[in-house]
Curated annotation (Swiss-Prot):
Annotated spans, Involved in the interaction with host DDB1: 153-159
Similarity field: Belongs to the HHV-5 HKLF1 family.
Mutagenesis or variant effect for residue 159 to A: Almost complete loss of interaction with host DDB1
Taxonomy, superkingdom: Viruses
InterPro entries: HHV5_RL1
Region feature (Disordered): 1-44, 205-252
Transmembrane feature ranges: none
Gene it is expressed from: RL1
Purpose of the protein: Degrades the host antiviral factor SLFN11 via the cullin4-RING E3 ubiquitin ligase (CRL4) complex.
Name of the featured protein: Protein RL1
């Protein structure tokens, strides 16, 4: 016979977010809520109804915003963690395409999303929305599919008279991580361009700016590093050709040869930047760009004022 005691307990459904707070030794023993505390039980059920209404309102708002791309959300999205994880992975691509099509720079990321830079993923370029087959904006899968060089495609379209843009400007530079054979992330440089007719971004992977200059994409200016080896000083004019009486026949560096350290001259950023600035470039920001091998025309490169690279 079942017990008819007034102090007997019954099971009260808990909020999914509160289920993980139950201790393990209570999983098969007495629940927490008792029938004597009907007021607390009623408040708990009221809170659950409010939460369900809140979730339904959020789902309705998302359904109205995204149209039919997102199915109706569950009343409790975290009720089953496995289903929620599968739900999020299944609809991630649809949501990404939708956000990309909202506007020109909605969620495309420029030039690489910061989260993707931290994560080091290499599929960020292929996650863009799929454009029409006759659109050669070169952003998304058209720029990397089949490893076709973007410059060749652009020149071919312009040669055939199918290019509806009149200017190609450099938008800036970015970096993308590739996993090498040793499992180490190798960062390669990007030159991101804008097509004047489309307004879409053109991605061009280049290991250095010299190759882009050789293809005619950069101004013809010498941006190659100059020699940083110490140069002999010009002879100083003297009034007498006789040697100094206290000058030794053999200097100290011949008695105790000091091996020259190339890292002290070549890999010293201060000396390298100073010589590059003095002989090759005009201002300090051009020197820094030439030093790191990233050429960005100042009149076409835009970035936030407090995050300038110079």
């Amino acid at each position: 016979m079942p017990a008819t005691d007034t102090n007997s307990t019954h099971t009260t459904p808990l909020h999914p977010e509160d289920q993980h707070t139950l201790p393990l030794h209570h999983s098969t023993t007495q629940p927490h809520v008792q029938t004597s505390d009907k007021h607390a039980d009623k408040q708990h059920r009221t809170q659950m109804e409010l939460d369900a209404a809140d979730y339904a309102a959020c789902a309705q708002a998302r359904q109205h915003l995204y149209g039919q791309t997102q199915p109706q959300l569950h009343a409790y999205p975290n009720a089953n963690p496995q289903e929620s994880a599968h739900f999020r992975t299944e609809n991630q691509h649809q949501l990404t395409n939708l956000l990309h099509n909202i506007g020109e720079g909605a969620a495309l990321g420029y030039p690489v999303p910061r989260a993707e830079i931290r994560r080091g993923g290499g599929d960020w370029a292929d996650s863009a929305s799929d454009f029409d087959a006759d659109c050669w904006c070169m952003w998304g899968r058209f720029g990397t599919m089949g490893r076709q060089p973007v410059v060749t495609l652009l020149l071919a379209r312009q040669r055939d008279g199918l290019a509806d843009w009149n200017v190609v400007r450099c938008r800036g530079t970015g970096f993308r991580a590739h996993d090498s054979e040793d499992g180490v992330s190798v960062w390669r440089q990007h030159l991101v361009f804008l097509l004047g007719g489309h307004g879409r971004r053109v991605q061009l992977e280049r290991p250095s700016a010299g190759e882009a200059q050789a293809r005619g994409l950069l101004p013809r200016i010498r941006i190659t590093p100059i020699s940083t080896s110490p140069r002999p000083k010009p002879p100083q004019p003297t009034t007498s050709t006789a040697s100094h009486p206290h000058a030794t026949a053999r200097p100290d560096h011949t008695l105790f040869p000091v091996p020259s350290t190339p890292s002290a001259t070549v890999h010293n950023p201060r000396n390298y930047a100073v010589q590059l600035h003095a002989e090759t470039t005009r201002t300090w920001r051009w020197a820094r760009r030439g030093e790191r091998g990233a050429w960005m025309p100042a009149e076409t490169f835009t970035c936030p004022k407090d995050k300038r690279p110079w």
